[in-house]
Each structure stands twice: as C-alpha cells, then as structure tokens.
Amino acid sequence: MEDTQDLNEQSVKKTCPEADVSEPQNSRSMEMQDLASPHALVGGSDTPGSSKLDKSGLSSTSVTTNGTGVSLLAVKTEPLHSSESTTTTGDGALDTFTGSVITSSGYSPRSAQQYSPQLYPSKPYPHILSTPAAQTMSAYAGQTQYSGMQQPAVYTAYSQTGQPYSLPAYDLGVMLPAIKTESGLSQTQSPLQSGCLSYSPGFSTPQPGQTPYSYQMPGSSFAPSSTIYANNSVSNSTNFSSSQQDYPSYTAFGQNQYAQYYSASTYGAYMTSNNTADGTSSSTSTYQLQESLQGLTSQPGEFDTVQSPSTPIKDLDDRTCRSSGSKSRGRGRKNNPSPPPDSDLERVFVWDLDETIIVFHSLLTGSYAQKYGKDPPMAVTLGLRMEEMIFNLADTHLFFNDLEECDQVHIDDVSSDDNGQDLSTYSFATDGFHAAASSANLCLPTGVRGGVDWMRKLAFRYRRVKELYNTYKNNVGGLLGPAKRDAWLQLRAEIEGLTDSWLTNALKSLSIISTRSNCVNVLVTTTQLIPALAKVLLYSLGGAFPIENIYSATKIGKESCFERIVSRFGTNITYVVIGDGRDEEHAANQHNMPFWRISSHSDLLALHQALELEYL
C-alpha cells in the first residue's frame, strides 16, 4: 500500500511539466486502452518492468485536485454519435472507460486477446479509485428503462468463446428470459451491429479488457461487449448520469442445465436493426432461419425430455406408472388386435349356431329325427361322427386340451398378455403350460388366473388359434390332411342329405349379408370358444364369420355377449337377432332388438327371401 501511495504522489508531481510531451500515435492508443482497466494497470506495478504508470504513461492525462486533497483522474471521452465531449471522473464505474476510450476516433484499440489474465489481478486500490461496498453498474446509452431498480451483486467477467449472434436489447425484461441456448453459429459479430447484446453460449478464461461484466439469467448468459455498447445508436434522451442507471440483479443459473431442451442447430439473427434514433446509419445484416420445420421435428427426443424438480406426489405417480407399465410393456400393439368396425356399418346380424345355422345337437339327441321322420339311429350316428371330428380338430390343432379349462368369451380377451413374440419356432409342447395348469389348477370358473409367465403362454395359444383359423377358414381340407379330408367331405354330404340341406339354406342367407358392405354377421353360441371355432371350420362357415365376430356365451351368457357387441359396434345401428332358443330371444328383448326365429326349413327360406328383397 505504501508503494501505491508513493506512486500516486509521483504521478501528481510529474504530470504538469510533462503534459505537453508528444507521443507517437500507437503509444497513445495503447495507453488509452490500458485506462479501460485502471485496476489492472496498478496491479502490474508490483513487478519490475510491468508498471504502466510511469512518466510516459501519464503524458496524455491530466490530474486535478478537487480541493480536498484527493486526486481525480479526468479522461476526455468522445461518444461515437455525438459531437459533444464528455468528461468522466474516476469515481464512476469501471466500465465507463471501456465504452468511451476504446471507440474514440483516432485510436486503434488493442485486441483483448493480447493481454493475459494473469497480468491483471483484480485487487482493490482505494487510493486510486474508491470502491463502494455495493458497487453500482452503470447502464449504457439508450437503456434507460432499468433506472432506479435495485443494485446488483458483483459479477464475474466471462468472455465470448463461441461465435456470437445478436439479439435485440430493447425490452430485455420480456425477451431475455425466453432466449434459447443454441450453439454452432457461423456468423460473426459486426462492429456496426448496434442496439444488440452479444450472446455466447460458452465460458472460458476471463479477459478483463473485453468484458468487464456479464449478466446471467435463467437458461442463458449474456456477455456485454464494450464495442457493442459504444456503438449503441439509441441516444439517451433523458441525459441520465451513469449513477442513475442501474441494471437489476439477476439470479445466476447454469447454462448447461437448459441446453438439452433445444436443438444445436444453426440459426442466424432474426431481427434487423435499421432504424436509429439519432440519424446514424446501421448496417446490421438480416439473417433468415436456416432450418425448416422438418428439421426441427426430426429430433423429438430433445424436446420431450423435461428435467423438472421432483415432488413426492410426482414420485408416487412415477412409481405407479412404472409398476403398471412393467406388466403391459410390449403389449400396446396387442391390446386391440381386432380391426375396428366399419364407419359405414348400418346393420349387424347376430346369429345363434346350433339348430339355427347347423343341425348338430338335435342329431345327437335324436330330436331332429323324431320331428322330421328320419331314422333316429342314423341321425345319432352322424351326430357322433361329427362330434368326434370336431373335438379331434380342436385337440390336434386348436390346443383344446390346454384351453378347455381356460375358456374365453372372445379370441382377443387374453391378447393383452401377449408380448408379440415370434411363434414360428416356438414349441408349445415343451413350454410347460399344460403341466402348470394341471398341477396348480390355475384356470378356475371363477376367473382366477395364473402368473404373468403362464398368462403369456395362454395368450400365445390363442394367438396361434387365430392364425390357424384365418389361414384355413376357406380350406379346412388342407388343415385336416388328405385322409381326414375325404372322411370329412363324406360326413358333410350324409348330414346334408339327412337334414334336407339345412346348412345350404342357412349359407345362402349368410352369403347375402356378407356381400353387403354395410352389414356384418356375428356369431354367439353357448358352445365353448375352441369347439365353436372347430364347428365353424368344419361346417364351412369361416367365410361368413371372421374370428373377431365369434363370441362364446358359456361363461357369461348371451345377454352379456349382446352387451359386448353393442359396446363394440355402437348404438346407432340396427341389430337383428336370429336364433331358435329362448336365451337369444330374451337377450334380444332386453336390448330392444328384433328377433327372427328359426324353427324349421320354412323359416330359413323366409329369411333368405327377406334378405333378397332387402326387407332385412
């Protein structure tokens, strides 16, 4: 400190006799550049040869006394856009020298990169410049909207390491918080770009000669450049002094925590600053956005990830979602594998199977033979042969041995447990499904189900059944094989002869409905789902009934099946129920659906005629 006092006294004494000494132009420019950081100049006086305040260093300045014995430095400053000269005293903020000295006409400012930050330690020297406890930061010309606001804290100088781009500085309170942090810019800052803040997304070693202060805001960092503020073309119409214009204090947030929200794309400045207040011209160039919306949407992941503070309720919700999602992960595409109903659908025909479309149960009991005067033993024999073929097909190809105790109403009822695994090489015989089902009795009439692994194997079987049905619904002979195919065709012919072409007449009506684009056939049967599918295949009904339109009422009853059908197709269409029993008639009455009773061949013929004449 004593060296500093002696230095001040020497400076005062040596100024007067050497005030008229002329120095080369380049020497004066270096000295005026050094005045931009007077604390750095004094800080270098501790080492020999590094002192700037010698005789030649004071040749271009004058020292006066304010009457109290305190020496004040007076520097003649020349604003860029005004003919008036202003005098700034050493009591002002440090950044006043930067804005005036560097941009004065006739001087060539030295590049800030020529100075090393180690040469300028930022130690306070109260004998040269008084440093108040809460130092005020002076605003620059044209930014009068921040006057009278609270004083900021001391900020650390940051430098611009990346290529900056310009943002308008007029309404900072609105625009600055919404600035996106983006890097990779190729445009360079022009010295004539006025009225803008120089913005850089990165930080490096502070360079005091370039950026006296920086102001950090949430999501971004702003490093004011002395050149930018010196060229500010908006004049200070109210002539406020530097002490009356203060920046508000900003809360410092790290920039990197917001970088993941935005794409690191290349953008140019998107605003042109051509209008000036004092008549000077501005040559700020206009840049257009270089990236289209397609390029922005090509990186959706960067915008979806939001790192927000966690709350107890949110944590609980996240745990709930994770626990529920663990069971359904990979099933989203299997939740509704059935195609949605057609939008132009107008009428749904709900059919019963036994004794309506086919004659099967009455053959086994002999009731059909008695009613129509047929040979009862022959009828029962044909019924038993067809029953054997039905269950043989169900056991051999449709996993009825595994699924008999695990019956479902619809083929897609367990599809939510299917993870979509490829079944082309899957071994159903060795996956242990049947043994687990038999030992643990996991399929109960009450609806109790097994574990996740077992349910997945169950879903695999129903998916395989669906694939076989869709593959062979019009070619059952290919599924049965040559030997069984001949026996099946022989049996079908004998049954048709005994029943007087009952099935043929029913197929005529089904065919008419199937050819209509606004109508659909739905089958509801009291038979279990797997044997019902086998019946449909063996009676050549696969073309009339898609597997998604087949429901088994064994577990829930026909009325509940009708409710499911209505919920699937909607209430704005007409439902026609066709059957022979009291169950379907009662269910139709409960849902106000018209019922067409089938009790004889004449009923089938009348239905066919009504469909041909489009009464139905």
UniProtKB/Swiss-Prot annotation:
Residues 56-66 have a biased composition (Low complexity). The keyword Phosphoprotein applies. One of its GO terms (molecular function) is protein tyrosine phosphatase activity. In the embryo, expressed mainly in the craniofacial mesenchyme, dermamyotome and limb. It catalyses: O-phospho-L-tyrosyl-[protein] + H2O = L-tyrosyl-[protein] + phosphate. Its cofactor is Mg(2+). Binds 1 Mg(2+) ion per subunit. Gene3D superfamilies: 3.40.50.12350. Mg(2+) binds at residues 352, 354, 580. Its main location: cytoplasm. Keywords: Acetylation, Activator, Chromatin regulator, Cytoplasm, Developmental protein, DNA damage, DNA repair, Hydrolase, Isopeptide bond, Magnesium, Metal-binding, Nucleus, Phosphoprotein, Protein phosphatase, Transcription, Transcription regulation, Ubl conjugation. It is found in: Cytoplasm; Nucleus. The modification Phosphoserine is found at residue 338. The modification N-acetylmethionine is found at residue 1. GO terms for biological process: chromatin organization; DNA repair; middle ear morphogenesis; sensory perception of sound. Tyrosine phosphatase that specifically dephosphorylates 'Tyr-142' of histone H2AX (H2AXY142ph). 'Tyr-142' phosphorylation of histone H2AX plays a central role in DNA repair and acts as a mark that distinguishes between apoptotic and repair responses to genotoxic stress. Promotes efficient DNA repair by dephosphorylating H2AX, promoting the recruitment of DNA repair complexes containing MDC1. Its function as histone phosphatase probably explains its role in transcription regulation during organogenesis. May be involved in development of the eye. Belongs to the HAD-like hydrolase superfamily. EYA family. Interacts with SIX3; translocates EYA4 from the cytoplasm to the nucleus and promotes activation of their target genes. This is Protein phosphatase EYA4. The gene is Eya4.
